[in-house]
């Protein structure tokens, strides 16, 4: 038989049996194991827990208890909600049971009426099958409904679409409402109300028949969710769905952040658009210059108004040209370069001497080789100094060809031009600070002299092998056609930033030396500093030092660029920007380019004609004030700092002209009209120190400097005894040497001396702040609404260590050379002192210079020892047949004595006198 209906575990919903059920005791239904009856109390009603505290339930009972709790979660409801969930389809349960089991279930659910209706409700099973049991069940329940007015059993309906008993036979699976689709739930309207379980003996039920995968389906909800489907409150469901589907927009994030900001956003500086003619703008630009315009300034201003009056006005499209200013205003000729003329002329003369040209003398036969320029004179003296350098090894082998119409001339020979040692120079080193214009000037000179540049920059792989493969073939001999000699450009090899080498650039300098030695092309190297270059390349005749031009001339050039791009700014602002960036012309142009794109609107080309038929162009004037957005080093007093800091609260130049952006730093600027000046100054100092300390500690604390030296540098009266115990322990650990049993060897140079002014690259306020900030226990509140900033660290030594990483002594290549200079003495040279022992040298020299060679010697000795041992065992008989004396004689003949063999036998003995086993 099959029972389909709604189950409810709430027996109190039946008013007829409420009085009778209160006096009864609940009998838990066990599955395969019986449980002792538990009295039905208010706490453990229906599926109550055992009242015995401390008693451990068996595993089967615990699992049954969990299952009961789970069922209670879904089927227990209050009295008020019972009416609302009377027609709830989520409680639909379909069970397929036998006739005898159905009688037992009916006796459990209806113990009062079981004696009267047992014979009529559930007759004995017939042999006709399961359909007869189902029909009898439905008929008896319907007939019982008319006799019995109790709402124990409500009306039954068939759960299939055909509403016929025959279709119930096809339902062979038990369906839990969780695995049923929505359509099945809507068509199912059967109600079956459970009642208090009766009987004195717990009944044993079979294991539930779980649905198969074929009969399962996902719950699908329509656009609107029906509250009757879910047993839990609707409010929690809406919150859960909102958390999954809702996302804060970007505007909401910005608005919430802006609302929490203490500092109000400044109003955006409005730009004023003017209609002006190019001639008036050009005149205004000339009047703003401090000096008479230099050639490179005239080149920039020619974009506004051409210098030749006969030239028409095609300059308007060039003014509207888009792109980076560093490319837009890049020089195209030597006179357009913003640099000293001496440096430019030296490079240009050198490139002219390296250029391949035809011989100027007509007496030279046609078959002779093409020589260098006329600036190089051939040496007429037949006598040469033996120590002089032979240029024939470096001069290119050039094979000349006749015209294509001529026949092959066997007289075409390979000749080599002869140069003196002073005239030979096929490489040059150009130095200068970053952004001064080294590369742009080189490209301008090469473009003017018809040179093609082959550039190798740090972004490329520059190992020795790859460098020779890339440009090695380019530097070898080549064939030049006479008819195409003037039209063929020469080639210049440019090695950019040779002072910046990475780990993958192994063998770079060896490849450069080979390249210069065998190259037939001129080679130019650029660098920012010469401290890390080999000494062989630091020859004064081959170095061109780029120096910055005067600040007034640089200001004129920047102002001309701004006027050429139709941006009108006061000269004082340009001076402050140039003072901030120094000689970095590229950084100035990039910063102003970004600022102009943010602050100035895109100006369309609106041409208007006046009486003179001269077109109008639009220019903008910005309220760019001095000292805003850039650091002004001329600030000396606290009042100046307060005034400047209040103006610089928006940060850099880009943030200054984008006030609509959120100031993520949340700088607190107190209101001057509500507080006194001293209170404002105190809060400003704390805020400034706190912001500076965070950035400084984050940047500098990654290193591991020595604290003791820092104390000596910062305080002359400080000593090792004045330090705290923890600080002294850290100092001892910092001074722990890699040598076993030896303290740190003090550096004989200026490590313990106070730093020079040029070595201390710290701002004044940061230097003063480091001395006194971390001695304070905490910082005060810096905002008006009592918002506390994070407390500063109490560890003063922490910040002093960060300071030592900047001002600490760094190993200099000259110091290494001076220490190891005695190794370069000739054998015939007699010294008046004994060479120092390696243990007396600085620790860095021992680790970096001596240890690799010792390891190499040890490796080589062990390889030789293994080879001789293999040789002893391969002479037709095994090594065990050779006597010890014979083996010792063979090894002794190879140079191995007894002490050396003992030294090499132990793998940990080597270097144990110098290093620990962990550092070996």
From Swiss-Prot:
Localization (cell): Nucleus; Chromosome, Telomere
GO terms (BP aspect): DNA recombination; nuclear DNA replication; telomere maintenance; UV-damage excision repair
Top-level taxon of the source organism: Eukaryota
Pfam families hit by this protein: AAA
Main location: nucleus
Low complexity bias spans: 361-382
Bias-annotated ranges (Acidic residues): 388-407
Composition-biased stretches (Basic and acidic residues): 17-29
GO molecular function: ATP binding; ATP hydrolysis activity; DNA binding; DNA clamp loader activity; DNA clamp unloader activity
S-S pairs: none
Assembly: Heteropentamer of elg1, rfc2, rfc3, rfc4 and rfc5 forming the elg1-RFC complex.
Family recorded in the similarity comment: Belongs to the ELG1 family.
Function description: Involved in the negative control of telomere length and in telomeric silencing through a replication-mediated pathway. May have a role in Okazaki fragment maturation. Required for S-phase progression. An RFC-like complex (elg1-RFC) is formed where elg1 replaces rfc1 in the RFC complex. This complex appears to have a role in DNA replication, replication fork re-start, recombination and repair.
Protein name: Telomere length regulation protein elg1
Name of the coding gene: elg1
């Amino acid at each position: 038989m099959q029972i389909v209906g709604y189950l409810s575990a709430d027996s109190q919903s039946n008013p007829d049996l409420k009085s009778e059920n209160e006096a009864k005791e609940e009998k838990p239904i066990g599955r395969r194991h019986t449980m002792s009856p538990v009295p039905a109390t208010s706490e453990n009603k229906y599926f109550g827990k055992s009242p015995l505290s401390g008693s451990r339930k068996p595993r089967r009972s615990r699992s049954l208890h969990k299952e009961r709790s789970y069922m209670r979660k879904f089927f227990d409801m209050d009295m008020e909600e019972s009416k609302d969930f009377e027609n709830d389809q989520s409680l639909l349960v379909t069970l397929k049971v036998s006739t005898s089991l159905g009688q037992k279930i009916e006796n459990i659910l209806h113990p009062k009426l079981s004696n009267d209706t047992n014979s009529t409700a559930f007759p004995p099973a017939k042999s006709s099958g399961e359909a007869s049991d189902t029909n009898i069940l439905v008929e008896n329940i319907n007939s019982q409904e008319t006799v019995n007015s109790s709402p124990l059993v409500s009306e039954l309906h068939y759960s299939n679409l055909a509403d016929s008993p025959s279709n119930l036979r096809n339902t062979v699976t038990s369906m839990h409402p969780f695995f049923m689709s929505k359509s099945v739930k809507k068509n199912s309207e059967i109600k079956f109300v459970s009642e208090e379980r009766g009987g004195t003996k717990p009944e044993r039920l079979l294991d539930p028949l779980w649905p198969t995968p074929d009969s399962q389906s996902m719950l699908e909800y329509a656009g609107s969710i029906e509250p009757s489907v879910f047993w839990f409150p609707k409010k929690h469901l809406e919150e859960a769905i909102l958390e999954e589907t809702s996302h804060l927009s970007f505007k909401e994030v910005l608005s919430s952040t802006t609302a929490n900001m203490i500092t109000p956003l400044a109003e955006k500086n409005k730009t004023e658009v003017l209609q002006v003619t190019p001639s008036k703008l050009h005149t205004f630009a000339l009047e703003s210059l401090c000096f008479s315009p230099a050639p490179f300034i005239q080149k920039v201003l020619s974009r506004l108004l051409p210098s030749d009056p006969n030239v028409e006005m095609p300059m308007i499209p060039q003014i509207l040209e888009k792109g980076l200013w560093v490319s837009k205003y890049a020089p195209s000729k030597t006179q357009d370069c913003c640099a000293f003329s001496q440096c430019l002329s030296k490079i240009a003369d050198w490139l002219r001497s390296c250029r391949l040209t035809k011989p100027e003398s007509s007496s030279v036969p046609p078959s002779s080789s093409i020589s260098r320029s006329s600036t190089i004179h051939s040496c007429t003296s037949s006598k040469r100094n033996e120590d002089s350098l032979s240029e024939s090894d470096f001069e290119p082998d050039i094979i000349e060809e006749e015209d294509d119409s001529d026949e092959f001339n066997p007289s075409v020979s390979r000749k080599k031009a002869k140069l003196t040692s002073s005239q030979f120079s096929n490489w040059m080193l150009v130095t200068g600070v970053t952004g001064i214009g080294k590369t742009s000037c080189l490209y301008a000179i090469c473009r003017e002299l018809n040179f093609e540049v082959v550039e190798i920059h740090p972004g490329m792989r520059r190992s020795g092998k790859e460098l020779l493969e890339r440009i090695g073939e380019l530097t070898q001999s080549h064939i030049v056609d006479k008819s195409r000699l003037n039209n063929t450009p020469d080639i210049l090899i440019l090695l950019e930033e040779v002072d910046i080498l990475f780990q993958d650039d192994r063998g770079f300098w060896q490849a450069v030396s080979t390249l210069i030695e065998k190259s037939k092309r001129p080679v130019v190297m650029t660098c920012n500093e010469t401290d890390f270059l080999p000494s062989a390349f630091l020859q004064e005749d081959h170095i061109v030092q780029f120096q910055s031009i005067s600040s007034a001339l640089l200001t004129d050039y920047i102002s001309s660029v701004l006027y050429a791009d139709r941006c009108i700014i006061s000269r004082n602002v340009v001076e402050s920007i140039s003072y901030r960036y120094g000689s970095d012309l590229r950084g100035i142009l990039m910063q102003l380019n970004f600022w102009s794109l943010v602050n100035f609107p895109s100006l369309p080309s609106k041409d208007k004609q006046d009486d003179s038929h001269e077109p109008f162009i639009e220019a903008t004037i910005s309220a760019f004030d001095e000292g805003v957005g850039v650091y002004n080093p001329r600030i000396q007093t606290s009042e100046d700092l307060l005034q400047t800091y209040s103006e610089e609260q928006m940060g850099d130049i880009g943030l200054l002209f984008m006030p609509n952006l959120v100031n993520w730093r949340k700088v607190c600027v107190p209101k001057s009209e509500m507080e006194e000046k001293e209170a404002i100054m105190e809060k400003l100092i704390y805020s400034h120190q706190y912001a500076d300390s965070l950035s400084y500690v984050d940047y500098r604390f990654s290193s591991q400097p020595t604290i003791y030296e820092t104390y000596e540098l910062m305080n002359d009266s400080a000593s090792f005894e004045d330090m705290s115990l923890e600080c002294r322990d850290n100092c001892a650990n910092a001074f722990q040497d890699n040598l076993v049993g030896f303290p740190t060897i003090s550096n004989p140079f200026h490590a313990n001396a106070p730093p020079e002014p040029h070595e201390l690259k710290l701002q004044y306020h940061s230097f003063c702040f480091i001395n006194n900030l971390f001695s304070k226990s905490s910082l005060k509140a810096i905002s008006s609404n009592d918002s506390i900033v994070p407390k500063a660290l109490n560890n003063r030594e922490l910040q002093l260590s960060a300071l030592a990483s900047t001002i600490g002594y760094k190993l200099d290549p000259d110091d290494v050379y001076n220490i190891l200079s005695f190794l370069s003495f000739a054998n015939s040279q007699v010294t008046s002192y004994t060479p120092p022992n390696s243990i007396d040298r600085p620790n860095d020299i021992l680790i970096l210079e001596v240890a690799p060679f010792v390891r190499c010697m040890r490796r080589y000795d062990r390889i030789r020892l293994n080879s001789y041992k293999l040789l002893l065992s391969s002479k037709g008989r095994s090594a065990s047949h050779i006597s010890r004396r014979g083996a010792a004689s063979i090894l002794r003949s190879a140079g191995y004595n007894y002490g050396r063999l003992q030294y090499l036998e132990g793998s940990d003995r080597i270097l144990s006198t110098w290093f620990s086993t962990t550092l070996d």
